[in-house]
Amino acid sequence: MVDLVMRQTGGLAGRRLNDSGRSILMSLALSQVKEELVLYQKQSGSRELVELMLSALKEFKMCGIRPEDLKAAADRLEEGNLRKKIRETGLVMAAYEALVSQSYIDPLDDLTRLKNVLEATPFFKGYTVMVDAFAGFTAQELEVLSLVLRQAKETVISVCVDQDPAKDNGMGLFS
């Protein structure tokens, strides 16, 4: 869906990052903010911290958490290691995002970019949209799905039920 919308609205141009590119940019981001780090300063050049930050980055993006959200969360906490970790993670993520925005498109941002396009363009107006083959939705996916539901003329969602009707004596929701 991302590819289709972006092809028709012009959002595919740019160099797409892969895992190697992400690692390089995360290393650069850690170098840029090294002097501002307390808890992570000693490990800022380590491969392990790069991998840890990339793993956190992927989780945050799927959950729709931005660097400024981390800063706001840290500001609400009392002084301590948790506050420092969240604050420092937000600093690293902000530096990483700034590096990416200079020249690259991160596929991890595809759904966020799609959401932004759908907020500005009624792409699905007049269409019937079918939603199938899912086990659940991430925060990014829910934001996009919400916009699709508002725009589409009709939306059909298949519900997967791996349930034995005999277990509920034929009285279940999908019996």
Where are these regions (language model features)?
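Conserved helicase NTPase motor core
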Residues: 18-19, 69-175
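Conserved P-loop NTPase-based nucleic-acid remodeling module centered on helicase motor cores
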Residues: 1-72, 76, 80
